[in-house]
Amino acid sequence: MSNNPHRTHKRQKSSVSNPGYYFTPETKSEIQQQQPQQQESQQQQQQQQQQHSQTHNIYDNDNYMNYNFPPTSNRPRASTTTGTTSTTHPGSELSHESHSVHTSPLKRTASSELDQPIPAMAPSSPLVSSAPYYYQQPSQQQNLSYHDHHHQQQQQQSTPQGQQLSQQTQSNSQSGVPPPLYGTSSSIPPGSTMQPSTSFAFHTSHSTYNPSFDSSNLYNSAFRLPEYPTTSSSSLLSTTGGKQFQQSSALLPSGTLPPSILGTSSSSHVSALRQHQKNNLSISSHLTLFSLSGNNSSQLQSQGSSFQQSETGVDDTKRSSKESTTIFNDLLFHLTSVDGSNINTFLLSILRKINSPFTLDDFYNLLYNDRQRTLLDNSNYQNRIDKTIVSPSDTDMTVSIINQLLNFFKTPSMLVDYFPNMEDKDNKLANINYHELLRTFLAIKILHDILIQLPISEDDDPQNYTIPRLSIYKTYYIICQKLIASYPSASNTRNEQQKLILGQSKLGKLIKLVYPNLLIKRLGSRGESKYNYLGVMWNANIVQEEIKQLCDEHELNDLNEIFNSDNNNPFASIAPSGSATTGSTPRRGLSHKRTSSKQKIKTEPVAGNPFLQPLQTSHHHHHSHHHHHEEQSQEESLSQQMGEHITAPRLSFLRANSKYPTDVNLSVLDDDNWFVRLSYECYARQPALNRDLIQQIFLKNEFLLNNSSLLQNLMDSIIKPLVMQETYSNVDLVLYLAILLEILPYLLLVKSSTNINLLKNLRLNLLHLINNFNNELKKLDSPKFPIERSTIFLVLVKKLINLNDLLITFIKLINRDNCKTTMSSDIENFLKINSQTVKLDDDDNSFFFNLNTTSMGEVNFNFKNEILSNDLIYTLIGYNFDPTTNSELKSSISMNFINEEINVIDEFFKNDLLNFLSTDFHAGLDDDNGEEDDDEEAGPGSTHPMGATGSQGSLSPEPVSTGNPSVPPTRNTSISEVNAENKRGNEAVLTPKETAKLNSLISLIDKRLLSSQFKSKYPILMYNNCISYILNDILKHIFLKQQQQQLQSSSSQLHDTQPLTQQDTAQGIGSSSSNANNTNSSFGNWWVFNSFIQEYMSLIGELVGLHDNLV
């Protein structure tokens, strides 16, 4: 055995690399007084290190950890006696102690990408260090650091001098001297060669092939550390008075170092790797318990009871919080240099540095379902996909570290808080796609755990342990599908979750990353050979027979068809298998029950709406099992029949087969209506909701003075408490429905207490809510309030505001006699009778098309046949729906059925609407006042344009309205008086006469267009679209007829041969202009009316759909 000269430094070694610095054969007083004796003792210790380093193996030495400080920076006595020569750094509580992290020689060779140093740190980082070397290649350098403290402790304790040194260690630790971060070796019998099991679980096994850290770099300018005394974090309060440490750590999370420390001396974090337990056969263990070569079998067998005792001690001891902090700080230090080019390497380093058993089930739920806690803490062992047994302490530590690291990727600006010297431009985390990071992290974890790379010796043939390359991807694909089916996401559908599966090319790159030295060879007969990985085997805890059978018997295309088909999916009903044991909270229980999971999967191809699939949980705890099963079977049968020809909108709560309730009163005007009962049901379903608080936030004018008041109160008083409380499932939907039901009567103006100021402030606050609500939810980042659902809620809020605009505009318009007259005339002339088309000359090219050739320009036009019948037939054909059988349209439908269906709609437009326009609603006023009011509103000075109540949410009352029914307004009312009256804000938005008209219109729609005849036969989507077709065709028909009248009038004026005087000409032009204005006003009235009906029916349908998602 050669004795290579040990490389030495010119500067004195610190306590880490020089154990004789603190402990010499002399007494404590002699240490402080005799410097020559210290140097002699240090030389002796260095010789022992040289001799020891040549006879043992060293693995996984973290280069940047092994900083060796000069003696003057760590001498406890010198720091207290020579205060003028040493300075205390504010963030110096981090103990810079060097460790060589060792692993078993049976451990497989790790990623070569990890061997390469992570790219250079950002320029703002105070220290630049090389990447940690967990797995080294052969080198001839020797390690100067103190790498085998356990062995030396045993040598010291075996002699009286060693016992004295051990006593000095305890005395020094009490006096503020940082003790080495090693576990005690008292459990190891004297003379045993087995390495002790420490608090860091360093199972040391040395090798002469392990490279050492080139300590000559320690004193380069890039690695130089400030010379100030360092103390351990536990003793900082006593040495510094506690002021600086308390100030720096006041805002820090538990278990992390202060940013000031990480910004100045972050290169000294200690890496603490830990081997897996005996029962864990994931790839991180790498067969540490056996070897095919048998090189170390005799050593393991010779340990006997000592080995068992050591292993038991590791199993029973929880990993200390100090170790968790060390690992996190180590990873956090490397996070500063992470960008898109090395993110995969960093993710792999997280798993290897934590090096603790953590099941795929917990890992998947940590990434996609619940980052605050483990979802499977109470689940049955047999129901897990990964059967690896783990300890709760290891799981908690892993969850804590990964959660903290993921927060940096979600909020990259947090990194600057931990590293104050780092500039924003050097922070590359913002350029990393978070979704891509999560699915890549999951893929690395799966690859890391499903395979075991065997350490093949020269006598073993690696071809005895082979796995086809395609089988690895198919196994990865199957496991992802199994995780998706077993643990449905609360915010995404199964189709959305499919996006987390990587393609073959990217997974192949990750295989090379995780297993860089894995041998690959084409095996098989000529023409049928396939690429196989050599020297690997499956982890039986994860890859079980069921997965192997699917992988061996099916090609990749067949697997895609199997998992995309609900009938053939072998894991479609896996999720509820452990539901009985996972119901520690109501939310967990409802999200993992068999019926709800199956229903999600069964109805997904029907609805085609990715936002609604998580909402379709069966409300089984309110119904009997038999009734629920029967109802579900009927719904699934109807869904299967309609699934191919009806698709729900993406931003909608409606399902494909949602229908209006038939046995309830849908009119908002009645006291005991469906909306009132639904509101009570919402608060009964979620007791955590406070109705008085919601009404106070939304409907009290004093809480709506600022545009942001509603949003701030909603977040602080309602949503944030709901996030912290234990609530039932779909709490967000219940809250949204309760809010819509509370503000619905106010925006529809059916509440008599609605005044101008309240409506104006409410609209402004709702507009602010629409623009900023999703941003607040993103900051909250709670699975209880997914963005997909809140987006649909905001669409409904915007629909309510638009409905309020249309409603006010239409009521104000039809309150004028000329508007009522023109609309009534349109019905009499164009809809009620068989209108005759005026024949124009063929050479008349004054219009953009010939009106005689249009379908609505026929001589004998029939509104019932040409519009109503055709639109209903087009709707049934377009949706491929037969209302007589409530199924797919397979045969023709008789015209008698069509005529019977449209009779109600025909009666609505020809008679009901005409009576509504012709009836005067005076609301208790005498006729004179009503006529004067109408005349006044028809005047040119009191017009009410549509833009007065536009999307900006600004409302203004009628300029001439005084709000007093008994006092009619006058034309001579000054503007100042009107403005002064409006400022009082106590006037109602509508006059009593207008309110009566509004109530009549809403009642007409509820009872005629939403009659039971249509509600029982047609889905909401189909019926609402049919009404929209009819309204649009009516609008087009009226427009064409009005254009015909204008053309006829202009043609008659051109053919008039009588001479016109100048006065007659002016009168003719004025008359023509007046007719044109009337025509335009009539068309505008019809447009507002049509838009109001469509928005109103759409809103009612959405409320029904939202309710259906809760039952």
UniProtKB/Swiss-Prot annotation:
Quick check: keyword DNA-binding in the entry? yes
User: Which locations, inside or outside the cell, does it occupy?
Assistant: Nucleus
Q: What happens when the gene is disrupted?
A: Leads to increased resistance to UV-killing, derepression of various stress-related genes, hyperfilamentous growth, and overexpression of hypha-specific genes.
Compositional bias segments (type: Acidic residues): 926-938
Q: Which GO terms describe its molecular function?
A: DNA binding; DNA-binding transcription factor activity; DNA-binding transcription repressor activity
GO cellular component entries: NELF complex
DNA-binding region location: 450-540
Q: Where is the composition biased (Low complexity)?
A: 32-68, 79-88, 129-142, 153-175, 300-310
Which portions of the chain have biased composition (kind: Polar residues)?
69-78, 183-196, 570-585, 949-979, 1055-1070
Predominant localisation class: nucleus
What is its induction? Expression is negatively regulated by NRG1, and by the contact with host oral epithelial cells. Up-regulated during the yeast-to-hypha transition through the function of YAK1. Also regulated by SWI4, SWI6, and WOR1, a transcriptional regulator of white-opaque switching.
Question: What Pfam family is a match for this entry?
Answer: RFX_DNA_binding
Q: What does this protein do?
A: Transcriptional repressor which regulates DNA damage responses, morphogenesis, and virulence. Involved in the regulation of filamentous growth through its repression of hyphal-specific genes such as HWP1, ALS3, HYR1, ECE1, and CEK1.
Q: Can you say what this protein is called?
A: RFX-like DNA-binding protein RFX2
